[in-house]
Amino acid sequence: MVMEVPREIIEKLEIFQKLVKKWNKSINLVSDNTIHNFWQRHILDSLQLIQYIDNKEIHLVDIGSGSGLPGIVLSIAGVAQVSLIEADLRKCIFLEKASKISNNNIQIINQRIEKIEIDCSILTCRAFSNLNTIFNCIKNISVREKFLLLKGKNYLTEIVEAKERWLFGYLIHQSITCEEGKILEVSNLTKMI
């Protein structure tokens, strides 16, 4: 699949890439092993979620946002309102600086996810945790539409384990950046009694 991205968005994403690389020297935002392939591994990996967002005039919450992936990338790509939840104050300082690259509204929340009460249309996360942990952490977050979760090779095990405690619908989409990568589109999440 080829993604057509307007030049002005590419330019902003390039600025974001430079900022992440600069800050990564002092606070660990992304693995050093991925810096050489940053555009493919991080920018495109995050940007591919935009194809599953029909209406960009929404509120999207990104949990464990540390490096701004995918939240800031999706904001730059046109999502109107993004909240980035990150517990590490140093990473929040980075996110505050990076948020200025986007023309859209970005809110940085420096708290643990479990303590946040917020509602959104879509919730995202990348390299955060397994499904059970994600679902347990977001008890106070109301997700009206769906979750878009970037997952790796253990996604099926995560689904099976989560299905023991939770009811939810899901679609599995192939990542365009990694053969083992998947995008889980989760909806109608309810905890089993």
Swiss-Prot record:
It is an enzyme of class 2 (transferase). It catalyses: guanosine(527) in 16S rRNA + S-adenosyl-L-methionine = N(7)-methylguanosine(527) in 16S rRNA + S-adenosyl-L-homocysteine. S-adenosyl-L-methionine binds at residues 64, 69, 113-114, 126. One of its GO terms (molecular function) is rRNA (guanine-N7-)-methyltransferase activity. Its EC number is 2.1.1.170. Its main location: cytoplasm. The keyword Cytoplasm applies. It is found in: Cytoplasm. It comes from the Bacteria. Pfam families: GidB. Keywords: Cytoplasm, Methyltransferase, rRNA processing, S-adenosyl-L-methionine, Transferase. GO terms for cellular component: cytosol. Belongs to the methyltransferase superfamily. RNA methyltransferase RsmG family. Specifically methylates the N7 position of guanine in position 527 of 16S rRNA. This is Ribosomal RNA small subunit methyltransferase G. It comes from Rickettsia massiliae (strain Mtu5). The lineage of its organism: Bacteria, Pseudomonadati, Pseudomonadota, Alphaproteobacteria, Rickettsiales. The gene is rsmG.
